[in-house]
């Protein structure tokens, strides 16, 4: 959480999906469904959201039709993120999975697990080197590990993206290499706000 997932989804859709959608009504509806994103410590996403609600059909490389739908979810809580506590107590939220209210952190974890296990075809693990906001790198390590280990435990294919203000810098390179060594996966650094089409 607070790694740039919503920003990535918005940029991905803006650059790779919306320009290739032929139906204008579908394109406008998809724009309306894009997630909000902002910097800082405050959690923006509150529940899993399919973007777009119905998979968009686009053509890759000119003529290969594919259906694309991303899922924006809260992710596991990062230490230092805010927005899940009101007063001195954790916010209680209603979810589709329980008949009673549950703590926000539990809802985020349940929603994230459901996305990983039940909905995702390919996972995108979004993490950061700590340069994109107010949280430090160490605050992302536990939720990053939990996410990667969960995907590995069920054999779900995934990629790791390291969001960084300096994706070609030494710190981003070092963090990517640490992730690769620790989990045996490829980690790619990038500045997700700056994603551009070709």
Positions of PLM-derived features:
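Conserved ATPase-coupling elements of RecA-like P-loop NTPase cores
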Residues: 80-83, 134-139, 169-173
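Conserved beta-strand segments of the P-loop GTPase G domain that flank and frequently precede/overlap
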Residues: 124-129, 134, 160-162, 189-191
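Amphipathic helical hotspot of TIR/SEFIR-family domains
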Residues: 110-111, 132-155
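Inter-motif core of Ras-like GTPase G domains
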Residues: 81-132, 151
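Conserved catalytic network of the ASCE P-loop NTPase/AAA+ motor domain
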Residues: 59-64, 115-119, 150-154, 180-181
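Canonical P-loop GTPase G-domain recognition
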Residues: 146-159, 164-198
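Conserved nucleotide-binding/hydrolysis micro-motifs of P-loop NTPases
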Residues: 74-78, 129-132, 165-168, 193-196
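Conserved G1/Walker A P-loop phosphate-binding module
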Residues: 1-99, 117
């Amino acid at each position: 959480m607070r790694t740039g997932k919503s920003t990535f989804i918005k940029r991905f859709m803006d650059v790779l999906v919306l320009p290739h959608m032929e139906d204008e009504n579908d394109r406008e509806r998809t724009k309306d469904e894009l997630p909000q994103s902002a910097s800082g410590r405050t959690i923006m996403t509150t529940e899993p959201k399919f973007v777009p609600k119905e998979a968009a059909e686009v053509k890759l490389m000119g003529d290969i039709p594919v259906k694309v739908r991303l899922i924006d979810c809260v992710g596991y809580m990062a230490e230092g993120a805010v927005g899940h506590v009101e007063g001195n107590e954790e916010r209680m939220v209603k979810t589709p999975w329980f008949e009673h209210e549950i703590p926000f952190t539990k809802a985020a974890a349940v929603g994230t697990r459901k996305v990983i296990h039940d909905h995702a075809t390919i996972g995108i693990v979004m993490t950061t080197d700590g340069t994109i906001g107010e949280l430090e790198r160490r605050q992302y390590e536990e939720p990053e590990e939990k996410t990667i280990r969960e995907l590995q435990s069920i054999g779900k294919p995934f990629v790791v993206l390291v969001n960084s203000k300096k994706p070609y810098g030494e710190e981003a390179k070092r963090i990517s290499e640490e992730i690769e060594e620790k989990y045996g996966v490829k980690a790619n650094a990038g500045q997700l706000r700056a994603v551009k089409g070709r």
